[in-house]
Amino acid sequence: MEQCWRWYGPDDPVTLDHVRQAGATGVVSALHHIYDGRAWPEADVLERKRIIEAAGLTWSVVESIPVHNSFKIGAPERERYAGYYRDSIRTLATAGIKTICYNFMPVVDWTRTDLMYRLPTTGYALRFDAVDFAAYDLFVLQRKDGAASYTPARIAEAEKRLKALTSEQVDQIERNLIAGLPATERKYDRDSFREALAEYDGIGPKELRDNLAWFLREIIPVAEEEGVRMCIHPDDPPFSLYGLPRVVSTAQDARFILNAVDSPANGLTFCTGSYGTRADNDIVAMVKEFADRIHFVHLRNITIEEDGSFYEAEHLEGGTDMAHVILALMQEEARRRKEGRADWRIPMRPDHGHLLADDIGKKKINPGYSLIGRLKGLAELRGIMRAVEKFGLA
């Protein structure tokens, strides 16, 4: 597998020298300053590529080209933005960058309530507290019809939790939820967030799924012409938040997506951490089922708690059998090599990492994307890859 590393560009506190020191050879990056649906200018793409290659690395994966909200709500202007998206695909392909990750999550991207969850190891992880989330949704945001999303027991728990939280703790939860985590396209205050949610009135899973299928029909033919592999990232977490539909959460969802436009250009970013947050997702079985359409991999592990909360575990701990995931992926690589595919190598990155050692206390850290935690995770994952190779298992 191609060992990659997410890099947020020149302002990332983790430098490209650090990336090389971690042992990665590929970079996962994007033009994060262009988030409003405009086509990516060729000059900007080439400059980012130049910077990466000057450091002795390869820009292997784009993560992500943002998917404009008009696609998700089915607004008339989506026709115009589809043209911009196709232009960006062509520009990247011309520059030799042919793996493009994207997501179709409405309003909010990846979501956590706690960015500094202290672990027994004394490091820190990212956590989603289901009760804190409900308390915010019901009693701080006061979302219209919010109670319909929860059981009476959860509503009672949430009300009790809110009373136990200080105003500072509530403010911190709100910042974590709506002010924007790394790579999120939009940042909100409470009023603008309510307005964004209102755009989805009347849009349920069927409507969002239909809009995703429309998007795929518009962009996949161009990706196929250009030799580009599009790969959709799952919902994180893979269940409804704020009453919004989410349609990239299960194996059934993945089947719908791949069948909507049956093309090698239409594939998956297989994020073990996102899919793994649902106990009913059999991660190893999903990897095996969708292997030939997995174009990019995020390797991360999750520990799910009884009340539906979860936190990000060590890469080799948690609920996902990471060794068998990697084995299945490397066996797929071997199959592709035998088939003669030029794109046989699957790019992967260690997804998130604990906040550890000298990174603790640094003022400028992208949550989940500190250096040392990801370096540790990549080293552990690399160990499994080497063992698979050494023992001739793939």
UniProtKB/Swiss-Prot annotation:
Cofactor or coenzyme needed: Fe(2+); Mn(2+)
Record-listed E.C. numbers: 4.2.1.8
One GO process term, biological-process aspect: D-glucuronate catabolic process
EC class: lyase
Metal-binding is among the record's keywords: no
GO molecular function, one term: manganese ion binding
NCBIfam families in UniProt: PRK03906.1 (NF003027), uxuA (TIGR00695)
Pathway(s) it belongs to: Carbohydrate metabolism; pentose and glucuronate interconversion
Stated name of the protein: Mannonate dehydratase
Protein family per UniProt: Belongs to the mannonate dehydratase family.
Reactions listed under catalytic activity: D-mannonate = 2-dehydro-3-deoxy-D-gluconate + H2O
Entry-linked InterPro entries: Man_deHydtase (IPR004628), Xyl_isomerase-like_sf (IPR036237)
Domain of life according to the entry: Bacteria
Function: Catalyzes the dehydration of D-mannonate.
